[in-house]
Amino acid sequence: MALNGFLEFFQKGKTFRPKKPFASGTIRYSLHKQAQASLQSGINLRQVVRLPQGENLNDWLAVHVVDFFNRINLIYGTVSEFCNETTCPTMSGGSRYEYLWADGDLYKKPTALSAQKYIEHLMDWIETQINNEAVFPVSTDVPFPKNFIAISRKILTRLFRVFVHVYIHHFDRIVSIGAEAHVNACYKHFYYFVQEFDMISAKELEPLQEMTSRICKDKD
């Protein structure tokens, strides 16, 4: 399905935190609009994620990191009231996978947190990265940092863990509000993007491997 109904559907409900916009008139605003137009047209998602000819890879990555941050915030917002210290005492994906939080600041060592606390810290951390113009420069006159791809990989890897937790522990809520098709479409878009640019390791993708092979069948 096309993703054109995604934002309309989720913006009716609860947003976990404010959406991060792109500044009008910038290259990334134009790329964002181009990507949105492709999604709304229902084009094959494997083709949608490819770097447009002549465009800068870092700009393309930046646009998608912010977009996925916004979309996954919206998805988590629909289940956040059911995700608390009691229902989800650890940030996990079933019994086999548990994620520890470390940010080099408040949590210098990997620390077990509830899913709610982990995701709150994660979204704060990502927001800090996105708002830091030394990491996500607004002006084309300012170069991206040399480690921008590594930072993007870390952000996308951690956002994937939110998908893992939501799919394994809260998918009944997603189904109950009729959001299954929207969430699956967003996941497919995310998965094809991280595969196209090798942004997440195969080991990190393991928790949703079976589901991924079932729903991600778009041909090249």
Swiss-Prot record:
**According to its UniProt record, which protein family does this protein belong to?**
Belongs to the MOB1/phocein family.
Q: Which PANTHER family match?
A: MPS ONE BINDER KINASE ACTIVATOR-LIKE MOB
Cystines in this chain? none
What would you give as a GO molecular function for this chain, any one? protein kinase binding
**Record Pfam families:** Mob1_phocein (PF03637)
Record gene name: Mob3
Q: What does the record list as GO biological process?
A: signal transduction
Name by which UniProt lists this protein? MOB kinase activator-like 3
- Give the keywords, sorted: Metal-binding, Zinc
| Source organism (scientific name) | Drosophila melanogaster (Fruit fly)
- Determine the domain of life of the protein's source: Eukaryota
Q: Where does Zn(2+) bind?
A: 83, 88, 165, 170
The organism that produces this protein has a lineage beginning with: Eukaryota, Metazoa, Ecdysozoa, Arthropoda, Hexapoda
A single GO cellular-component term on record: cytoplasm
List each coiled-coil range: none
